[in-house]
C-alpha cells in the first residue's frame, strides 16, 4: 500500500513538472533593447518570441512552410512602427510585408520576388508607405551559396521616393566585391565603422571659392565642385558603399597681389607706374621763369658782349 502511494505521488510530481515546463516553453518572451542613434535620440526596439508559432513553423516542411517575423520600434519623433514580414522557407524571400504605426498608417504589400536556386541569385522588392504618406520602394539583389559559408556577395540597393504633394531625386548606390585587409595605421572600416550623421553638422557652404585679384581693378570669384568622401564596409557578407559630402575650414587665408612698378622698353628705362598713358605732354617751369622770359634772354646777350670787350682790352 505504501509503495503504491509513493508511486502515485512520484507520477503526480512528474506530471506537474512536465506541465510547468510546457507552460514555461509556451510563454511569450519579449525583449526590449534601447540604443542611441547617430542623432543622439533614444531608439527602443522590441522583439517578441512566441514558442508556439516557432513550433508550428518547425512542423511544416521546409519546401512549403512559412515563418513570420515581427519588429516593433519607436523612432526619434515618438512614432511606434510595427513591421510584420512573412518569409517563404523554400526561397527564403518575403511574401507579404505589413507595416502599421501609431499615427494610423497601415500598409500591406506583396513584394515582387524572384529566385534562381541553381545559381543562388535572389531578388526582392518591397514597397511601403511611411508616416508622411510617401511611397518608398526598396530593391535588393544578393547571392547565396549553399556549399560555402564565405562566398562572395554583391549588393545593389536603390531607393525611389514619390508622392502626390512632393518631389525628390532618386539616389542609387551599387557596390560589388569584398573587403580588403587593412595594412596601414587607419582603422579597418569593415570592423570599425561610424555611421554618417543623417543631417548636416555644420552651417558652412558646401561650395569652395577661389578669389583672384589682378592689380587693383579686377577681382573675380570661381567655384569648385563639392568634395565627396566614399566609405566601403562589409556587413553580413554584403559590401555597402556610402557617399557623404564634407566641408573643410581653414584657419588662415593667403593673398598675393602682383603690381610691378619698373620695367624696360628696349632703348631706355621707364620708371613709374606701368600701364598708365598720359593724355598730353607737360613741362614744368620753375623759379618763376615764365614771367621773366625776356629778361633772361637780355641777360644772356649782355654777358656775351662783356666777355668780348674784356678779351680785346
Swiss-Prot record:
Keywords: Cell membrane, Cell wall, Cell wall biogenesis/degradation, Glycoprotein, GPI-anchor, Lipoprotein, Membrane, Repeat, Secreted, Signal. One of its GO terms (molecular function) is structural constituent of cell wall. Residues 289-313 form a propeptide. The gene is KRE1. The keyword Glycoprotein applies. This is Protein KRE1. Present with 623 molecules/cell in log phase SD medium. The lineage of its organism: Eukaryota, Fungi, Dikarya, Ascomycota, Saccharomycotina. Sequence repeats lie at residues 72-86, 127-141. InterPro entries: Kre1.
Amino acid at each position: 500500500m505504501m509503495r503504491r502511494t509513493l508511486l502515485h505521488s512520484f507520477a503526480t510530481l512528474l506530471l506537474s513538472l512536465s506541465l510547468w515546463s510546457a507552460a514555461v516553453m509556451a510563454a511569450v518572451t519579449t525583449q526590449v533593447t534601447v540604443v542611441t542613434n547617430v542623432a543622439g535620440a533614444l531608439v527602443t526596439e522590441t522583439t517578441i518570441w512566441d514558442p508556439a508559432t516557432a513550433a508550428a513553423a518547425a512542423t511544416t516542411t521546409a519546401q512549403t512552410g512559412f515563418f513570420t517575423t515581427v519588429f516593433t520600434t519607436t523612432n526619434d519623433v515618438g512614432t511606434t512602427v510595427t513591421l510584420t514580414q512573412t518569409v517563404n522557407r523554400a526561397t527564403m524571400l518575403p511574401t507579404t510585408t505589413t507595416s502599421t504605426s501609431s499615427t494610423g498608417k497601415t500598409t500591406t504589400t506583396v513584394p515582387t520576388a524572384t529566385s534562381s536556386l541553381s545559381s543562388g541569385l535572389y531578388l526582392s522588392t518591397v514597397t511601403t508607405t511611411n508616416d508622411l504618406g510617401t511611397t518608398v520602394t526598396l530593391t535588393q539583389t544578393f547571392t547565396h551559396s549553399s556549399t560555402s559559408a564565405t562566398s562572395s556577395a554583391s549588393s545593389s540597393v536603390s531607393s525611389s521616393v514619390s508622392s502626390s504633394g512632393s518631389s525628390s531625386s532618386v539616389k542609387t548606390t551599387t557596390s560589388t566585391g569584398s573587403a580588403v585587409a587593412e595594412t596601414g595605421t587607419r582603422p579597418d572600416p569593415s570592423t570599425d565603422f561610424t555611421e554618417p550623421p543623417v543631417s548636416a553638422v555644420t552651417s558652412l557652404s558646401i561650395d569652395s571659392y577661389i578669389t583672384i585679384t589682378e592689380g587693383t581693378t579686377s577681382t573675380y570669384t570661381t567655384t569648385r565642385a563639392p568634395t565627396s568622401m566614399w566609405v566601403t564596409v562589409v556587413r553580413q557578407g554584403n559590401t555597402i558603399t556610402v557617399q557623404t559630402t564634407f566641408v573643410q575650414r581653414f584657419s588662415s587665408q593667403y593673398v598675393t597681389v602682383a603690381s610691378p612698378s619698373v620695367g624696360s622698353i628696349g632703348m631706355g628705362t621707364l620708371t613709374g607706374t606701368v600701364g598708365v598713358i598720359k593724355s598730353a605732354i607737360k613741362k614744368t617751369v620753375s623759379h618763376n621763369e615764365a614771367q621773366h622770359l625776356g629778361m633772361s634772354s637780355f641777360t644772356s646777350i649782355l654777358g656775351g658782349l662783356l666777355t668780348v670787350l674784356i678779351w680785346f682790352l
